[in-house]
Amino acid sequence: CLGITEIDPERSNLLFERFISRERNEPPDIDVDFEHQRREEVIQYIYDKYGQDRAAIAATVATYRTRSAIQDIGKALGLDIERTRRLSASLAWWDKTSDISQRLAENGFDPDSPVIQKLIQLIPVLYGFPRHLSQHVGGFVISRDKLCRIVPIENAAMADRRIIQWDKDDLAAVGLMKIDVLALGMLSAIRRTLDLVSARRDAPFRIQDIPAKDEATFDMICKADTIGVFQIESRAQMSMLPRLKPRSFYDLVIEVAIVRPGPIQGDMVHPYLRRRQELEVVEYPSEEVKSALKRTLGIPIFQEQVMQLAILAAGFTSGEADQLRRSMAAWKKKGGLSPFHGKIIDGMTSRGYTSEFAERIFRQIEGFGEYGFPESHAASFALLVYVSAWLKCHEPAAFLCAMLNSLPMGFYSASQLIQDARRHDVRIMPVDVTVSDWDCTIEEQFDKTLQSAQPDVRLGLNRVKGIGLEAAKRIVEARKISPFENPIDLANRASLNTAEMRALASSDALNTLSGHRRQTLWVVASHIKQRDLLRDAPIRETSPAITAAREGEEIMADYASMELTLRRHPLALLRPELARMNLNSAIELDNYPTGRLVRTTGIVTCRQRPGTASGVVFVTLEDETGITNVVVWNQLVLKQRREILNSRLLTVYGVWQCEGEVKHVIAKRLVDHSHLLGNLKVESRDFH
């Protein structure tokens, strides 16, 4: 009724007690997601509406982690700052305090030194201890009275912001209501895509205009062709999609929620998949349990289902069930579930359930302490999953354009998004000062020989390192008056300095005006410094003809200036050498039977080590033909840590596994072949 969500809670059968109940003596917790690029606009709106003295952002307590503990303890003990920094940087995101001794030895420290022994002793003591106050990601407190009369306030480092010096737990203790003003990059991307589609169709196009059950979209999702799609673009989600095979909106709700630490730790994922594939019979001990778990085949996946089980099967009141929900997230920190154990077991056994079933339900509830997902959140996220998937499927050019303009967000870099779009027959045009705006744009194809129904994507000046928004605005405004004659004319009329002109030349954005990159760099270097003295004098000197760089050098220059290339993939140039090494491409692996020994190589684009994966690292490799997923078991991670962490070009010897659309290499040996890339700098994104 407020119009802030597209999800109908009644139609979706969402549990109202999850939001509010009679026994809850406090207002509900409210989270509202906004476009990440407009979040500051919303924050300033709140300050303007309620006043700086009645609205402020909550604090969060930043605690010591291993790296920060090493650096601060090292300073206190008088250790060399640079060596301490190197030690801290050598730690992987998964390293524990128990790994410090080995890292010390690797970085040239003497583990037996009294000072180093003191360092080793103090790190676990300091770990988890409060270090400083930081700003909450979006927790706003709005009060009727002046906040300074209730809580301590300080000015934030960022202009026009004020911070409460208490965290969310402190605020809850005094009964202050917090509203989370959160930023979601996909909202920016979707809004931008809809704007582009509306402009192209010359008619408004809204989320509501997207068909509800599009078979092509679900086909794409089931094949895990979801790079860039909200929530289901991670390795774990892409691995789950061909197994779960979503064919409806509610399937997407389950998909969003099931690949979470809660269901994984609670041993809910595999039983659900077996039942979905009709490999296991679905049985319910009672009609009450069936009413709560029927939609998820007898497996509790959502927080609301745990609350319903507590109410229907264990005799909890709505308020007690909500207290159980609150305790689930805190049980590891505060032991909050122990008081509920007896009540759950006794309540269920007194109603005829076996103690074994009751204990299993309690263990699954404990699993939700590892971040189980509310069905209401999953439903809202599933809508964004479907919308973004539909846009990627049917409007890939507009979707790519919007994604590039919404970065940074998600799992993938601009280069990876572009490579994926090209595999979907989207043509990307280079940055060009004669046509590019600040943002990337879409252009209708004027080449009638092309059969694609999609427009081209023109890269914007925002892709060029060293060019800011103000410089781009000056370029566009000057271009509106008359076309640029040459780079010097551009520099004069757009008031560009030497660094900005060099950035444009390095990115090949001046190609239309003065030829290839080397030629343009020479023109800029030889003439730009003279322009202030001889601004109105005609340039009579003829530039010498300079040979264009080789393709490999051009690709390296592209990555250095924009972190992407529209030329051939770097591995296309290396393919003859890789073939001599008997290394398979990604597309060749697709034709192999499961269980075959394979060897492949690719640029490392992503490393993931989920906390629920028992030390397993998932690596994504990219070559000119596609993507290869690699699974590295913990034993090999420990043995070849350096190759996993430092390789830009990683060669994997292993076993090919293929089950339907689920395909990956189980690594047996890793080799770092980064030297083959020379000075090419490629971006890898690491998640945990």
Regions found by a protein language model. Give the residues of each.
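Noncatalytic, beta-rich nucleic-acid-contacting surfaces in large DNA/RNA-processing enzymes
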Residues: 1-688
